[in-house]
């Protein structure tokens, strides 16, 4: 029954065979990173991962770890996991230009978080009217430290659905 055990893993980053799971930081639909309308993400300049077309209002911790930085404009944050993953979550494209409007910080930098802990509130209807795109890239910036990345597709629930996994 090893096949079915993969569907019922504990809610932590590390599963069997040194595979580390990354969970959805926001609910919505997975989009290929290459489809993000910003070359920094679509060309994988800052790392590899996926994007999510969001349909909810809170960005959650996608891994267990420590919040490294919450950007002053509240549109992005980074987390370093207990498994040495450096993860970057960036809400929308050109959201930095809003200077924090439409966002509210829930958590703080240098705080230990668990999968599903709230980090930033977003006013999705407000932001949809003002930004180029609400696609939310979720990127591993130190992807070169891992052997393999396996990306999932489909609809996701924040804090519950694995969006991709990496193998050490």
Curated annotation (Swiss-Prot):
Zn(2+) binds at residues 75, 90. Residues 38-142 form the PTS EIIA type-1 domain. GO terms for cellular component: cytoplasm. NCBIfam families: PRK09439.1, PTBA. The active site is at 90 (tele-phosphohistidine intermediate). GO terms for biological process: phosphoenolpyruvate-dependent sugar phosphotransferase system. PROSITE patterns: PTS_EIIA_TYPE_1 (PS51093). The modification Phosphohistidine is found at residue 90. Its cofactor is Zn(2+). The EIIA domain is phosphorylated by phospho-HPr on a histidyl residue. Then, it transfers the phosphoryl group to the EIIB domain. It is found in: Cytoplasm. One of its GO terms (molecular function) is kinase activity. SUPFAM superfamilies: Duplicated hybrid motif. This is PTS system glucose-specific EIIA component. Pfam families: PTS_EIIA_1 (PF00358). The record marks 75 as: Important for phospho-donor activity. The phosphoenolpyruvate-dependent sugar phosphotransferase system (sugar PTS), a major carbohydrate active transport system, catalyzes the phosphorylation of incoming sugar substrates concomitantly with their translocation across the cell membrane. The enzyme II complex composed of PtsG and Crr is involved in glucose transport. Keywords: Cytoplasm, Kinase, Metal-binding, Phosphoprotein, Phosphotransferase system, Sugar transport, Transferase, Transport, Zinc.
């Amino acid at each position: 029954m090893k096949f079915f055990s993969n569907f019922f893993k504990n809610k932590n980053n590390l599963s069997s065979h040194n595979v580390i799971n990354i969970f959805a930081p926001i609910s919505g639909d997975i989009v290929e990173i290459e489809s993000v309308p910003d070359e920094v993400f679509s060309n994988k300049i800052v790392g590899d991962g996926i994007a999510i077309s969001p349909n909810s209002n809170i960005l959650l911790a996608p891994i267990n770890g420590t919040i490294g930085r919450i950007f002053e404009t509240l549109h992005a944050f980074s987390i370093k996991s207990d498994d040495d993953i450096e993860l970057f979550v960036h809400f929308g494209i050109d959201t930095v230009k809003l200077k924090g409007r439409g966002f509210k910080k829930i958590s703080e930098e240098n705080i230990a978080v668990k999968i599903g802990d709230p980090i930033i509130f977003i006013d999705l209807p407000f932001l949809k009217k003002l930004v180029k795109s609400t696609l939310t890239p979720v990127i591993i910036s130190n992807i070169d430290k891992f052997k393999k990345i396996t990306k999932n597709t489909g609809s996701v629930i924040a804090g519950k659905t694995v969006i991709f996994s990496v193998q050490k």
